Amino acid sequence: MLNKLNLNKLFFIAITLSIFTLEAQESSDESADSMEEVITTARRTEESVSDVPIAISAFSGTDLDEKGITNMEDIRSLVPNMLIQKSAGNQSVAYVSVRGMGSQRGSVQYDNKIAIYVDDAFMIRPQGSLFDLFDVNNLQVLKGPQGTLFGKNTTSGAILVNNNLPVVGEFDSSVKVSMGQRNLNSIAAMVNVPLTSNAALRFVGITKKQDGYINNLDGFADDGGIIDNETFRAMLSVDITEDLNLLYTYSMFDSAGTPVYANCEVYTNSNMLSGGPAINVLTNGMKTRAVESC
């Protein structure tokens, strides 16, 4: 009798565990089906990321918003084997490397090894590549040589940024306000305005300001690391026919912040007069006054 009761208990426990396993599997399947599918243009045509035979990291605009990505520099936290560094001499210049290959040159005479495309427009030089992000449709990072479809400057890969296009026949708007440490203040706004039954305008504006984190001791210049960015984008879309669309885009990014100095320590120089600011002579002959990290 005792053995029979034990067998009944084991049978009941086995059935219960099976039911829980089935419910968990169904819940997991429903969650997978509800995931947002990201469409990529890595092969110059719209495809699902899962169908593209390329090492790619792709994110929708919703993904970027949920992860707090507001600037090109932030995407380094999302993409494996990718490094984005801000130039010490220019707040808007990015040094990008993928799989250990990239460029550490920020001058206008040097080409990148990783191409950046914004709405299919190639950014020729690294200046202005650390722009702010808002109202983005998707962002894609292609790893490995991409010269066949994207031409030169793609030895290590390519970054594709596709913004939301104007929507015909629909008025829409959105505003995002951000505040943070070092007096961070950021306002981003978007307005979509329908003009006619086949034309629409879309405006995006971003302003971002933040105090620097490097104190300048001599008092004759601003602190290092100040962020003062302004972004404006206007897009006009006209559906000429069902198969022909005219898209005009004007984009402006202004970065008036102060650079992060090459060295952030206090230097003393016995050749300087007592009480005078220390001078650090850099390897390229440039000079910077003494600064102190906060």
Question: What kind of region is each of these model predictions?
Answer:
Residues 96-100, 214-215, 259-260:
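Short secondary-structure transition/capping segments
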Residues 42, 120, 143, 179, ...:
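Residue-level signature of outer-membrane beta-barrel architecture
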Residues 221, 227-294:
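Outer-membrane beta-barrel domain signature, strongest for Gram-negative TonB-dependent receptors
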Residues 1-31:
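Cleavable N-terminal targeting peptides that direct proteins into the secretory/outer-membrane pathway or into
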Residues 31-168:
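Acidic, small-polar-rich N-terminal luminal/periplasmic segments of exported/outer-membrane proteins
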Residues 111-113, 125, 134-143, 148-218, ...:
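Outer-membrane beta-barrel translocator/receptor signature
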